[in-house]
Amino acid sequence: MNRETAERCTIVRGLVGSTVHGLNVNDGIEDRDEMGICVEPLEEAMALWAPFEQFIYRTAAEREGRDDARSTAGDLDLTIYSLRKWTRLALKGNPTIMLLLFTPEDQLVYCDELGAELRALTPAIVSRRVQGPFLGYLQAQKQRLTGERGQKRIHRPELEEMYGFDTKYAMHMLRLGFQGVGC
């Protein structure tokens, strides 16, 4: 599915990155992270080939010509999930996928009637069963941050140099822990 179709079929789209959580560092290199959910067109849903699951668009990757390009000020990192994939992951308690359920109204880029209905179902989707996945995700983030699991991840070398670790990554890790406790 191409970007035009993914955006045309979107039912809800909003900010999901550090800005929406109040964790942006205002260092002039903030990108814009957005997530959306779309209802794939009938021809995609009924296709004989692998069904559409997600569309990813990154202006940094497009500009640099490589997928691992670091986003800079003004870049857009957009992921649009099919409703089918989003639902499967949400019911498993995936912390990232559930962000759109809690994104404040003023941080939504787009929300039609179906998107509003989906967001209204939040109490039916979220249960205490999500605490396990949240805890697992939190532990994996900590292990990546400290190098206990695989190679130590350094996304922001300037923060690593200044504080000894990536403080923004650490704040996202703590946010996940608090969100999991609140469920």
PLM regions and their residue ranges:
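Active-site nucleotide-donor binding segment shared across nucleotidyl transfer reactions
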Residues: M1-W49
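Short, solvent-exposed secondary-structure capping/transition elements
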Residues: E44-A47, L99, G182-C183
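Cytochrome P450 catalytic domain signature, combining two hallmark sequence patches
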Residues: F52-F55
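Conserved NTP/Mg2+-binding pocket subregion across the NTase superfamily
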Residues: Y57-V181
